[in-house]
From Swiss-Prot:
Gene name per UniProt: Vgll3
Name the UniProt record assigns to this protein: Transcription cofactor vestigial-like protein 3
Family to which this protein belongs: Belongs to the vestigial family.
Annotated organism of origin: Mus musculus (Mouse)
Comp. bias regions, Acidic residues: 64-78
A GO BP annotation: regulation of DNA-templated transcription
């Protein structure tokens, strides 16, 4: 062994740790005795050994450093936008894509559609079948409904039945008027009602149907009452028709001449025009004779006011007329 080789022996604290080999010491006179280092020195030695190990690591060459720098620059260039557009003070548009956008989009969609058809052909067929099933169901439903309609419904000669306009409102409502509800009677046969009518009454419609008989059909005495009312009050119509009753004609002039033979003598006398100077006299005589005649004719049917009271009322009325006339 050479003199540089030494043997390490673990020793207690304070004892020398490095002892020279006796054989080496005998052969090498330069070998000397060194005392063992302290614990602080041991730590320093450990740190020193680590520093040497780190220095022994091979450092990168200059070429490698340059390559790394170039790669970093390329990455930075990729991260930078290809186009920058200033929109406003708070918005700037950066465009990172380079190339033709339209061609890239077309290529993307064509590739996606091709993959969908090639990878999932069974799913596409099942979807098409699922889309057709509602049509089959609808066609079957239409065929079942078609069997419910008559054959003429599906041809051009089909005519729909008339819709009930009024019959569908209520089951008890009759669309057509029952037979015998209205009778087309001659309007001249109604006393007093034919005075202002120029033509026959219009035929009744379905909406104006009335299920109750007219008053003339219920009580036969209605016509007698109406005639009596006309012949009591209308003889004075020619006296004051110039004042406020100008739209009411006189009874004698408005009656049909066909009924002249049915009138009583007092009414016939009223039809003859009298001079203006004898108006009050003719009115008084006509009223008194008419009241006495009508009282005798309809004593059993209608109760009439006594002629005395009626005449006194008419005389009072005639006096008031005379005062305004003259």
């Amino acid at each position: 062994m050479s003199c540089a080789e030494v043997m390490y022996h673990p020793q207690p604290y304070g004892a020398p740790q490095y002892l020279p080999n006796p054989v080496a010491a005998a052969t090498c006179p330069t070998a000397c005795y060194h005392p063992a280092p302290q614990p602080g020195q041991q730590k320093k030695l450990a740190v020193y050994s680590k520093m040497q190990d780190s220095l022994e690591v091979t450092l990168p060459s200059k070429q490698e450093e340059e390559e790394e720098e170039e790669e970093d620059e390329e990455e930075e260039e990729k991260d930078q936008p290809a186009e920058m557009e200033y929109l406003n003070s708070r918005c700037v548009l950066f465009t990172y894509f380079q190339g033709d956008i339209g061609s890239v989009v077309d290529e993307h969609f064509s590739r996606a559609l091709g993959q969908a058809n090639t990878l999932h052909p069974e799913s596409a067929i099942s979807k098409s079948k699922m889309g057709l099933t509602p049509l089959w169901r609808d066609s079957s439903a239409l065929s079942s409904q078609r069997s419910n309609f008559p054959t003429s419904f599906w041809t051009s000669s089909y005519q729909p039945p008339p819709a009930p306009c009024l019959g569908g409102v209520h089951p008890d409502f009759q669309v057509t008027a029952p037979h015998g509800t209205f009778t087309t009677a001659d309007p001249n046969s109604w006393p007093g009602h034919g005075l202002h009518q120029t033509g026959p009454a219009p035929p009744p419609t379905a909406s104006e149907s009335w299920h109750y008989p007219l008053a003339s059909q219920v009580s036969p005495s209605y016509s007698h009452m109406h005639d009596m009312y006309l012949r009591h009050h209308h003889p004075h119509a020619h006296v004051h028709h110039r004042h406020h009753h100008h739209h009411h004609p006189t009874a004698g002039s408005a009656l049909d001449p066909a009924y002249g033979h049915l009138l009583m003598p007092s009414v016939r006398a009223a039809r003859i025009p009298a001079p203006q100077c004898d108006i009050t006299k003719t009115d008084l005589t006509t009223v008194t004779t008419a009241t006495s005649a009508w009282a005798g004719a309809f004593h059993g049917t209608v109760d009439i006011v006594p002629s005395v009271g009626f005449d006194t009322g008419l005389q009072h009325q005639d006096k008031s007329k005379e005062s305004t006339w003259y």
